[in-house]
């Protein structure tokens, strides 16, 4: 830091792990075949209120796409406001007629997207509808997530008058130059002045800050904290910036338009500085990322409870929820959601909860509040070994008389990685083969989605739709696809090898993505395999392929991660990807056009 603070390992341990990564949200779930979804929904919905729950309403619109954000879905249009609000209210009303039980909603969260993009009258009536159709607890925390654009003080006051009691504003940083590069229209001084006025209304006001942003020096981070704590805020959230591959900012970094974000050495120190500074200023740490100032009403209830797998009712396009031992996602395609017949739940994904999912909720909740119950891993030698290693690394404090170990500042910073590693020590659950053919409706929706954005991760779409990789390929725009018989695998592999030029060979499995760039070696068939010649030099592709498993070969030409790509995709009899071969690039980083033409000719020959 600017003040040259020397942190102890308990405060900052930047070299503890090579990466800081959480589990996928769907981890621990057992996929349920699509034909069963509606029956399960009808059986479970009457019992949704058998216990207390949370409610999440998703507003999937943004006025612009901030380059650091991975939650952008739909561009905002004023015409959406009343139509979308009507549809969510209709969705809530239909479920209210069926639900039974005495459970209460302990927290409501309007997330997005940008919920505050809705027009004032629509946002207010959606809040009132929650009180009409949901069993809201007397002490319910009711949060509206928003940003300064489209959310003036009058609209904020209308939200409070309608029944909200907590407002969360994503500031990220008060540094004007960084804000502008991130896609934020207002400068830092404007943000500060806005928050001063917002804090005058009778509500809990929370601000989100990010650390580890590109160009965010230690001095900038210190100033961000100073400015935030100078405001009469109730809560303050500090999140580490993650450079996920699909974010627009990643393309900017690759092209040199934005500097690379700082590494863990800086992030860990900035987190330690935030924890230390906020404690000195009288703030209480209520979770790994959340801080509350005493006697200003901040409870952080939703953010803490949602990680414990407490039931959460989901409403709106793209919203995710769970109850009755299963998780689900509401249809994320906006047009499809808006066209949902009255009284129906348009479900896009459903999975059952395995015992591992239940345990994950306990571990996540405990670690969010800064502790770990060792008894949860009794008999798990692998987990116990990890915990002992982490204690030696000084990520934990000594075990207390209550059987809990406390995470210190370093442990809390690395908690996503700790949770991930602990859960991956558990035995995997046997899963039914739930892969199925796409329905005509699914095909239409996938085609529309891929027409808008053909650069999506096809493997992820296959998992979400419980279909094969090949089924997703067939939904790509026609100008992206060429197909030939799988029986030509040997011919095509030998043709590529004859180029004597570098290509990229990729094998993508559920457990790894392996890439090798170099000349593809020749090969020949023998003993049921296509056997690559093994060159004397080290490295390169070598091994054996069950060539008879190849049922189809596709040439895909499409954008991916901001770049043009051209690749051969070899498909097995189950519709899965055996491997892929991507066209090489020249010294300027451009695809080699003569390789593209050579691949096309291979398919013209068919």
Functional labels for PLM-detected ranges:
Residues 55-57, 169, 570:
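Short beta-strand motif preference
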Residues 410-434:
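Short, amphipathic alpha-helical interaction segments positioned at domain boundaries
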């Amino acid at each position: 830091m600017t003040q040259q603070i020397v942190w102890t390992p308990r405060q900052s341990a930047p070299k503890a792990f090579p990466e800081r990564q959480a589990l996928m949200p769907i981890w621990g779930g057992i996929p349920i075949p699509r034909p069963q979804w509606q029956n399960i929904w009808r059986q479970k919905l009457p019992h949704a209120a058998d216990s207390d729950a949370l409610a999440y309403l998703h507003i999937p619109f943004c006025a612009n796409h901030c380059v650091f954000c991975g939650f952008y879905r739909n561009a905002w249009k004023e015409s959406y406001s009343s139509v979308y609000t009507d549809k969510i209210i209709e969705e809530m009303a239909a479920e209210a007629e069926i639900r039974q039980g005495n459970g209460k909603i302990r927290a409501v969260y309007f997330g997005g997207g940008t919920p505050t993009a809705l027009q004032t009258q629509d946002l207010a009536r959606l809040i009132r509808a929650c009180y009409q159709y949901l069993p809201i607890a007397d002490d319910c925390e009711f949060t509206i997530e928003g940003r300064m654009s489209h959310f003036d003080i009058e609209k904020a006051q209308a939200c409070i008058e309608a029944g909200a009691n907590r407002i969360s504003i994503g500031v990220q940083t008060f540094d004007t130059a960084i804000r502008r590069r991130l896609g934020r229209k207002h400068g830092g001084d404007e943000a500060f002045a806005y928050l001063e006025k917002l804090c005058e209304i009778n509500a809990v006001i929370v601000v989100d800050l990010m650390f580890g942003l590109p160009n965010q020096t230690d001095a900038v981070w210190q100033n961000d904290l100073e400015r935030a704590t100078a405001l009469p805020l109730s809560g303050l959230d500090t999140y580490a910036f993650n450079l996920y591959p699909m974010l627009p900012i990643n393309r900017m970094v690759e092209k040199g338009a934005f500097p690379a974000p700082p590494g863990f050495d800086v992030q860990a120190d900035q987190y330690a500085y935030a924890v230390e500074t906020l404690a000195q200023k009288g703030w209480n740490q209520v979770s790994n990322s959340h801080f509350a100032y005493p006697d200003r009403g901040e409870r952080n209830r939703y953010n803490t409870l949602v990680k414990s797998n407490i039931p959460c009712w989901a409403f709106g396009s793209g919203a995710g929820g769970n109850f009755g031992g299963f998780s689900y996602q509401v249809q994320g395609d906006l047009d499809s959601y808006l066209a949902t017949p009255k009284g129906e739940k348009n479900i896009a994904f459903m999975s059952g909860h395995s015992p591992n999912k239940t345990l994950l909720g306990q571990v996540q909740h405990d670690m969010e509040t800064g502790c770990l119950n060792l008894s949860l891993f009794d008999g798990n030698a692998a987990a116990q070994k990890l915990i002992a290693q982490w204690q030696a690394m000084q990520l934990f404090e000594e075990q207390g008389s209550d059987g809990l170990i406390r995470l210190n500042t370093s442990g809390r910073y690395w908690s996503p990685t700790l949770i991930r590693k602990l859960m991956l020590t558990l035995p995997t659950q046997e899963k039914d083969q739930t892969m199925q053919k796409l329905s005509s409706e699914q095909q239409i929706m996938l085609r529309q989605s891929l027409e808008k954005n053909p650069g999506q991760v096809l493997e992820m779409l296959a998992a979400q739709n419980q279909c094969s990789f090949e089924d997703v390929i067939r939904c790509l725009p026609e100008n992206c696809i060429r197909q030939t018989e799988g029986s030509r695998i040997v011919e095509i592999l030998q043709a590529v090898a004859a180029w004597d030029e570098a290509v990229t060979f990729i094998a993508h499995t559920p457990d790894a993505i392996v890439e090798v760039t170099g000349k593809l070696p020749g090969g020949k068939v023998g003993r049921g395999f296509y056997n690559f010649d093994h060159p004397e030099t080290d490295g390169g592709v070598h091994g054996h392929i069950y060539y008879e498993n190849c049922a189809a070969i596709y040439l895909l030409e499409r954008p991916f991660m901001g770049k043009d790509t051209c690749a051969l995709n070899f498909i097995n009899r189950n519709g899965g990807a055996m491997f892929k071969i991507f066209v090489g690039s020249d010294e300027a980083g451009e695809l080699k056009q003569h390789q593209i033409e050579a691949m096309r000719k291979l398919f013209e020959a068919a």
